């Protein structure tokens, strides 16, 4: 294998490889090449929400790197473990999801993962295959492999114990079940975010318990969201969804905080930061263009860039620019309608009250005209047909009659 490929695999966008670091991974790769046996590289995802965002793509991109080098990429859907709920990063127990919810979310995850992974060679599995059939004796064997003290060494559990917050016994099963997945799949390497270190080590421990060669673990950094502070999350509204329209995606990424731009380039693109312009604004634009072009197409990214510039400068843009603006059909609302209600219906604000707040703050424009009256309303669709509705500098809708 090419030395540069190995260096990229073990270094680019990688937080830690354990045990043994990059040397251990290099040995595994060399042994696999000598034996002409591809490595089995596992990535488990619990479908606990219906959509993927850029934070999820960091580890998916790393899985694709292994896949492109001829190794067996395994995308494991946590159909069973998602019903338990991963306690990682949580100060209290997660609400439990139903099997129907998990199945619905899993379908969406797989559809969106096609944007990153090659499904022609991907092995897709679901841990309900083996976990739903475990009998009590097998579960006791898993529980007996780990002490309560070891579980409390997991930061989240330890903090909750010290705070007197309830820790439920089914939560202890989560890392054990995730670890058993590696046994069932004969994983050689498991990928995950840095917050998954405890769970990845559990996979090694259980593989040894069951007489198998323990996997290597490779972690990737957690992507900080657009607020520049916390991990990217839809609930914190600091995210970029992988299926967002090109204009929204471009507009969000063009506002990436300066301190995050280099990190985003490393984790979300194949571009070298050293070859980029030193101008911070030009870097932001290049980042937005690269990521939007990757998840949509270079042509759509360019149209989004032109449309975003037209919307922000107030030039109105050309017909081609307007075509890049996502549409909202006015047939989906009843007239007369208040502007705040329209903002919610069009997906520009999560709630009517947030729409009112944005109007009062002067963030709402209709065809570049700022509207600050929270009681603003419209009697009929004809008043809005063809108009561009805008909230801030990132969110746009073109209002169409049908």
Swiss-Prot record:
Keywords for this protein: Aminoacyl-tRNA synthetase, ATP-binding, Cytoplasm, Ligase, Nucleotide-binding, Protein biosynthesis, RNA-binding
EC number: 6.1.1.1
GO CC annotations, alphabetized: cytosol
Chemical reaction(s) catalysed: tRNA(Tyr) + L-tyrosine + ATP = L-tyrosyl-tRNA(Tyr) + AMP + diphosphate + H(+)
MF GO annotations: ATP binding; RNA binding; tyrosine-tRNA ligase activity
InterPro entries: aa-tRNA-synth_Ic, Rossmann-like_a/b/a_fold, S4_RNA-bd, S4_RNA-bd_sf, Tyr-tRNA-ligase, Tyr-tRNA-ligase_bac-type, Tyr-tRNA-ligase_bac_2
Positions contributing to ATP binding: 234
Membrane-spanning residues: none
Record bears the keyword DNA-binding: no
Residue positions of motif 'HIGH' region: 47-56
HAMAP family referenced in this protein's UniProt entry, alphabetically: Tyr_tRNA_synth_type2 (MF_02007)
PANTHER family: TYROSINE--TRNA LIGASE, TYROSYL-TRNA SYNTHETASE
Entry similarity comment: Belongs to the class-I aminoacyl-tRNA synthetase family. TyrS type 2 subfamily.
Oligomer and partners: Homodimer.
UniProt name for this protein: Tyrosine--tRNA ligase
Classification of source organism: Bacteria, Bacillati, Cyanobacteriota, Cyanophyceae, Gloeobacterales
